[in-house]
Amino acid sequence: MTARTAVQQGSHGATRFTHEGIAFGCDYNPEQWASEVWQEDVQLMRKAGVDLAAINIFGGSHLEPQPGQSDFTTLDAVLDLLHANGIRVNLGTGTSSPPPWLTTLHPEILPVAQDGTTRNPGGRQAWCPSSPVFRVHALALVEKVAERYGHHPAVALWHVSNELGCHNALCYDEDTAAAFRGWLRARYGTIEALNAAWGTSFWSQQYGQWAEIGTPMLTLSTRNPSQVIDFHRFSSDELLDYYRREVEVLRRHSTAPVTTNFMVTAHIRNLDYWTWAPEVDIVANDHYLDHRLADPTTELSFAADLTRGLAGGNAWLLMEQSTGAVNWQPYNLAKAPGQMTRNSLAHVARGAEAVCFFQWRASQQGSEKFHSALVPHAGTDTEVWREVVDLGATLDHLDEIVGTTVVADVAVMFSWESWWAADGESRPTHAVSYLDRVHATYAALHELGITVDIVSPDADLSGYRLVVVPGLYLVSDAQAAHLADYVERGGHALVTFFSGIVDEDDRVRLGGYPGAFRDLLGITVEEFSPLQPDHTVTLDSGATASLWTERLHTCGAEAVARYVDGPLPGTAAITRTSHGTGVAWYLATVLEPGALRDLMRTVSRGAGVTPLGPESDGTVEVVRRADADRSYLFVINHGSCDVSIPAAGHELVCGTTVESTLCVPAGAVRVVREDTAP
């Protein structure tokens, strides 16, 4: 195996995270098991090839069983055992959930929900991010852990808390209200500026002094949307501040890199990870298939591409996933044979250089006892365990891909701020959601075999042939000008409805929709005209659409397709215009998936985009990782039939030579070191 190229620069004196090849890891919770099980654990880890273990994630009550008491006996022994067996440690700070004695002595640290009720201990994350009492106790524990293990040879990485903000991101107590007011003072300076930003002349909400402002708890009616989005921003910043406080403590005692596990997965939207990503020494993400979605497998690819975007195109760590079923969905589906491997390598294809799981050994008790694990309740004579061992061997075969990355010609813009604002309480229709529109856009490109980067509205767009902007409801003047400049200089863009509508304060841009993008697109919309969820309209192209139409007028743009029925027959539904040396498209409705794919094919071809893989229903994924000297083609076949892909080189999974055509069996993954680097 070859030592990994440094994947991300450590900050504030930290070293870079390096590893021999692709890390294969897990959450390891030995405190749940008798000590005689630990020796078997490390033997099995070595058999499977597991070489990175996250420990002490929920260790707080073990390290501090009572006030003033510390017990590091178990953690000492586990660290030494792992190190002796060549297993590196991703060491948790132990602060993710407070011990019962702390919430008993200080119930004021407990989070308060938007209805004003206190959330009790007994689950996890029973703390408010703004609680000064919790911070004092948590940082004191971090100090002890960092001082004791800051130079332990097993520690490869620090793991701050766990899934920050998963349950407690939005807290509505008095400590939070005070911190929110401080954040608002820093943002606006004067109460007059805040009133202007929040539009408080509406509904007699004008504030006279800072003390009058609280958290946006539930009201008798809908809440002020400008206050709500600022509270989302504040809450993300407040948890980021907490993360920084833990990092400051760790830096005093250790130069090991520091991270925390993001949750770029399905519906979770509590934190703005564009602001978080620069703060971690390497981006790490937890991802779980969510079967409440129409297409969980395509969402996995989207999440992996978004995580790579957060990492700035550099390598990142898949910190958690499952071998099979989870425990927290209404219907927790097991994975089919081979699916765990396909999921894992889909992440690797999109830039991951660690494949880790929750958890090592399935728990006997607790809320997650039916969550799958590397070692299931039934033990090692199981299909799951055999696939785990095979996956470890496969990752070893792929070690040489480390240091390469993914290059895409197409970017899709994504914004947590726009998500928060677009899905507010008061919007034209609740049948349309931001994430659905983003996922649909991505799926259409994915099914065309087109590789995609997910980027922020502030990203450098100069390297892309096509930029797609799905439902970017909230956009700043600078971001709008940034996209217009990209098109002016020869880029191609596709903007979809409900984009550019408001500024950063959720203030509607006057003069007609789509506000910030009106001039770029050569159109104006005088009125939204949403449809009932069971209604459809037909376009003169033959396409079917639903959920949304607009009273649109072209102002220089060409009408590519018009409605032939519905509330606005004859009105343009798709437009195209030249802008500078580039082209800007606009989609004013929700096309059915096949029609959206057809539109994306037309737009991408016009932009000069060449698909890497074949068109499919998402069952075949083709992704290339490369650098200046090497090129690797990943082909992931989720389908029930064998597929053939043009390729030549050395196939790494099976160790065979590919002359001109790669055959990938149903349900399999193949990775070819291509003969000719790009």
Q: What positions do the PLM features span?
A:
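N-terminal carbohydrate-binding accessory modules
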Residues: M1-A54, P65, D80-A84, R88, ...
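Polysaccharide-binding and catalytic clefts of secreted carbohydrate-active enzymes
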Residues: D115-I282, D286-L300
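Conserved, mostly hydrophobic/aromatic
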Residues: C26, M45, A53, L82, ...
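Carbohydrate-binding surfaces of carbohydrate-active enzymes
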Residues: W210-I213, R244, R252, N285-P678
